[in-house]
Amino acid sequence: QAAGILLPLLIIMDFSAIYLYWKKWLNNIVKIIIPASIIGILFGTFTFQYTNENQIRIVVGAISIIFVLVSFIQRNNLLLKPTNIKGYFWSSIAGYTSFLIHAGNPPINFYMLPLKLDKVSFIGTMTLAFLVINVVKLIPYYYVGLLAPSNLIVSLMLLPLAFVSVLFGYFLQKKIPEKLFFNIVYILLFLSGCKLIFDGVI
């Protein structure tokens, strides 16, 4: 039920953010992320009823923590070196985890952070990618009955908060220096990993 409430909100937030970051994305990266993510969504659609969501939370959370630690301890580690193959792999995982547990952001970060983009291109690319991912998810979510009218009413009630969040993030990004911005992204990724493990265990 929570997933059905979140998805319409995320889409509205994505449309709001894409207006603010219009044409700030990098097409060569988007062309890798979107097709692979759609494959992951399709795989999730047909396997979700056989999947243990808590196990996925624990695995994604653990990888998130390891990724952040390795990134800070060994920045030149070959495991972090970005390649197109890693892009397709992590993007497909992102589509899968986004469909199942609304946690597509960590796997996308495993690919995008090592690319060392500037913060505007990073946000613009991420925004367009997740706009498409979330819109595509509408079809399978409707198919499995997660887009119930009662869920949509709750989503509408939370709309003002969604708009405020997007605007706050936009203006905050403009004030934060590049290095600090990405340090915050790494910290949030680490905390997200801890939260996923906690949710998976509890």
Name these PLM-found stretches:
Residues 43-49, 57, 97-103, 137-138, ...:
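Hydrophobic alpha-helical transmembrane segments in multi-pass integral membrane proteins
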Residues 16-22, 59-83, 170-171, 191-202:
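Transmembrane helix exit motif
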Residues 7, 61-64, 68, 127, ...:
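Residues within membrane-spanning alpha-helices of integral membrane proteins
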Residues 4-73:
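Membrane helix-loop-helix hairpins that form the core translocation module of multi-pass transporters
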Residues 1-31, 90-95, 105-159, 163-166:
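Small-residue-rich hydrophobic segments that form or flank transmembrane alpha-helices
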Residues 168-190:
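Interfacial loop-to-transmembrane junctions
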Residues 45-55, 79-80, 141-153, 199-202:
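Membrane-interface helix termini and inter-helical loops of multi-pass transporters
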